Amino acid sequence: GCFQMIRFASRRMMKQRYGRIINVSSVSGVAGNAGQANYCASKAGMIGLTKSAAKELASRGITCNAIAPGFVKTEMTDVLSDEVKENAKKQIPLGRFAEPEDIANAAVFLASDKAAYITGQVLLVDGGMVM
């Protein structure tokens, strides 16, 4: 998964002395969630991997960051009941789920030269749900 991809991609990036690695974790990896210990642990592990890779690869011109989305309008959230969706939205200061484009825009930013001095960070894209 994530570890193998970093290993594979970083080899070429090291030769170029430039690269951007962007992992997609979850707010659950930051804050946890009752009943989802396995999912939360895997996403928290990805955050730890991101930070370690950032430290290992920075001297070679490679940044490594993670995006941690909250609720996003996808097939995964479409199956939730209206009651669950409304309760979730009450926990989000912006009062809505993210659009997939909101997550994509965060990735585009982290991949850009405007994020050249950002590494080892977790960018929460969650409408303020975790702060």
What does each of the following model-derived ranges do?
Residues G1, G32, A37-G45:
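The catalytic Tyr-X3-Lys active-site helix of short-chain dehydrogenase/reductase
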Residues R11, K55-S59, A116:
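Alpha-helical segment proximal to the catalytic Tyr-Lys
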Residues S26:
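Residue(s) in the substrate-gating loop at a strand-loop-helix junction
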Residues A31-A34, V108, T119-M131:
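Short C-terminal tail/terminal secondary-structure segment
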